[in-house]
Amino acid sequence: MKRQIAFLVGFAVLAFIAVVIAPAPAAAQTAPTKPLTIESLYQPGGLGGRGPETVEWSPDGTKLTFVQRDERGEKGELWYADAATGEKKVLVSAAKLAALDPDVNKVKNEREKERLTRYHVAAYLWAPDSKHLIFDSQGQLWLYDLGSETAVQFTSAPDPSGDPKFSPDGGHLAYIRKHNLYVRPVSGKTEKQLTHDTGDSLFNGDIDWVYAEELAVRSNYFWSPDSKEIVFLHMDETNVPVYPITDWMPTHPSVDNEKYPKVGDPNPVVKLGVVDADKGKVRWISLTTDAETYVPRFGWVADGVIWAEVMNRTEDKLDLYFVDAKSGKSRIVLTENTPGAWIDFDHVEARFLKNGKFLWPSWRDGNMHLYLYSFDRSNPMAADAKLETQLTKGDFEVLSIEGADEAAGTVFFSANKDDPRQTHIFSVQLDGSGMKALSSEEGEHFANFSDDGKHYTHMFFGPQNAASISLCAVGGACTPVWQARNEIADYGLRAPKYLEFKADDGTVLYGRLLLPPDGTASGKIPLIINIYGGPAAQMVTKGVPNAFDEILARKGFAIFAVDNRGTPGRDRKFQTAIRHEFGAVELKDQLTALDQLLAQYPQLDGSRVAIWGWSNGGSMTLYAMTHSDRFTAGVAVAPVTDQLNYDTIYTERYMGLLKDDKAGYEQSDVTKSAEKLHGALLLVHGTSDDNVHFQNSIQMIDALIKAGKQFRLMIYPNKTHSISGKDARIHLFTMIEDHFERELK
């Protein structure tokens, strides 16, 4: 149930999220030059124009490459910006790229399209020599020679090949086909199959749904530094239950059975293997006797030594193992415990440096900070890892490690220092000194550093200017790479008022309010609350203006959002306030903030308040409408209605195991409170949602009917969790707007 924003792929998708969902920054009101409508949000390129896709650095750090398509996405070129000069040139022409990297919108299968965009699957990969590229052209791999400007089809099997990886010496390419590992010499034609399992339940180096969605796993195999071996994760999903996803459009509907572990179900059984890339012999590694564990991250410390993170099922303990790849012997070198909380897995990932040290993010002092550990590089198995120093300190959250310049002893990271509603780029020395900001303008800043840490791409969503991407030298100048159209000026997007409230325990809650344009409101103003409310997303950040909020405001509504306890971006105490109890704390904070808002703004009509949200926001909408009488109307899009319907990793992380807290699960089940529904409900779901299953809404429909409650329903055939596509999105947001017009006026 995560909302994920990645820098490397799909800037156009990110820009859409910012325009439609993310909150607005402080900016001066401007007179619009273009009409703002729901249809305009989905014009080719959106409001700001189609941005670069698959932004990558060449391994030698000399080129920043990206795919730039026309507004419709039908034609594109692979460009590069020279790191030294900033000069931009075409690297692969449109005629050649059309076959090598087709537009993702041409993918017909909605679930595959969502996988490619949601999980940011890169369309091309640099070779270590920075002279070749491998393209994944909808399952067939092509090797492109930059010198001769020619492409050779590398795979041609009937089944698709994916997740390609060059060996560090550049001599071989590994890839996944039908859940098995393959390898082939770059200069040869003989393909070797390294693993030989059959069926759809055994994975070797491939990724299942729940690891991809909830542990952000994007690859499950890695080459050894000497290019001789590959470590991979074997996943056995034999005992994982299936969920049927039905395609209703053919005369005879078809069913795809998705492996999906729900709360209390068996998880995939996993183990690490090491395979010889030449001989294909596999050695299995034993890490723990506990079968109820996750192995979400692993890699190579050095030749012959593997690292692996192992987390227990309750997700409050994580062990870092070092493993002798030859003997399979392992030892725990570091343990992270979070009693009374959970492992904040979006951030806790070891990053190994070349000097026998590694970076380790931890919540241990109450905030997410960076710690530097060392080990004996000549004999990594000899002793536990040694804590050298805490690199960052203070009342803020480190959000991500972005890169490192090991020669200069510098680490780069993003954090929300001074304001949890902003994201900035920082650097700090490996001795913990000299922390400084690399960005300063109010807003959201994201970075992608070259391997040597000398240059970075800087993506900026600011309050006064359109979104942009620049190429920057560390400590030097930045050169523009791409600039969005100025949607703020063109469409007259306005900033909200940024507000602060106090929860019952005194905790500061951040909110935002957008009122109708001056002089357009007559009488009391109806209020719409846009909610997410869960552990995966903030609603109140200082990014680009929210266009849908502006559309609603021009219809005479006020739009409000507040980040309750349990949302990210704050300290451990704030985030874990919802542990073992979804709904109650969140709603309490929302209502407390609402009362304070109504007291501050008497022009708002407290008798006409609506609420709406998507995913967890849809769940919270249903919870609010069945556990209070404050809401006149609501829209719940793709909601979880019973936490037992959602996956193990996400739900058990926050709610605990079912056997330990049945009462907590029962109180969060909104189907059990259907008879208490207050207000006019619009319930929305896509039938092919493989994340939050359509089953959730079916159960809610049944409960509401039995309770004698009337409601509106919209089902989107074959649409996934994002309900994507121009036609579906225009229909959906028009229906949401219409629902509020009907019920609040």
Task: Please report, for each region that a protein language model flagged, where it lies by residue.
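Positively charged n-region of N-terminal signal peptides that target proteins for export
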Residues: 1-4, 745
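Polar/charged alpha-helical tracts
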Residues: 2-3, 31, 84, 99, ...
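Sequence-pattern detector for short linear motifs
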Residues: 5-6, 53, 712, 732
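Generic alpha-helix initiation/capping and coil-helix boundary signal
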Residues: 5-11, 157, 504, 617, ...
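Beta-propeller folds
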Residues: 7, 11-13, 21-449, 454-456, ...
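Serine-hydrolase catalytic core recognition
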Residues: 241-242, 297-299, 304, 309-311, ...
